[in-house]
């Protein structure tokens, strides 16, 4: 299965995610939804930001030029929100699974889908 199929079939097709991407920890973009604008700089910055609450709280989370307010996170997760939209990011051994959602999707719905894929990737050393 290609990375694009994971984005399309395991994230967006659930209807719990509006747009998604799977990116390398080096900032490379492996697959993304149509219409999701990402830069390698944004992705690389996010990859370095796990467990850096102070930096994320001060600077927010930037995806596609949009700044999301940092809500919470740890060494594996980053969560953010802007108005009626949000972002949920899971870090694996080699990648980040990034999902955006918008109302009426609830943050918890997006989180379950993204974390399920992230956990599967971790279990398979990806």
UniProtKB/Swiss-Prot annotation:
Annotated InterPro entries: PFN, PFN_euk, PFN_sf, Profilin_CS
Pfam families, alphabetized: Profilin
Keyword Disulfide bond carried by entry: no
Keywords (A to Z) from UniProt: Actin-binding, Cytoplasm, Cytoskeleton
Subcellular location, principal: cytoplasm
Gene3D superfamilies reported in the protein's UniProt record: Dynein light chain 2a, cytoplasmic (3.30.450.30)
GO BP annotation list: regulation of cellular component organization
Location in the cell: Cytoplasm, Cytoskeleton
Domain of life, per lineage: Eukaryota
Recorded GO CC terms: cell cortex; cytoskeleton
Entry keyword annotation includes Aminoacyl-tRNA synthetase: no
Entry's Gene Ontology molecular function annotations: actin monomer binding
Family under the similarity heading: Belongs to the profilin family.
Described purpose of this protein according to its UniProt entry: Binds to actin and affects the structure of the cytoskeleton. At high concentrations, profilin prevents the polymerization of actin, whereas it enhances it at low concentrations. By binding to PIP2, it inhibits the formation of IP3 and DG.
Self-association and partners: Occurs in many kinds of cells as a complex with monomeric actin in a 1:1 ratio.
Name the UniProt record assigns to this protein: Profilin
Organism in which the protein naturally occurs: Branchiostoma belcheri
Taxon lineage: Eukaryota, Metazoa, Chordata, Cephalochordata, Leptocardii
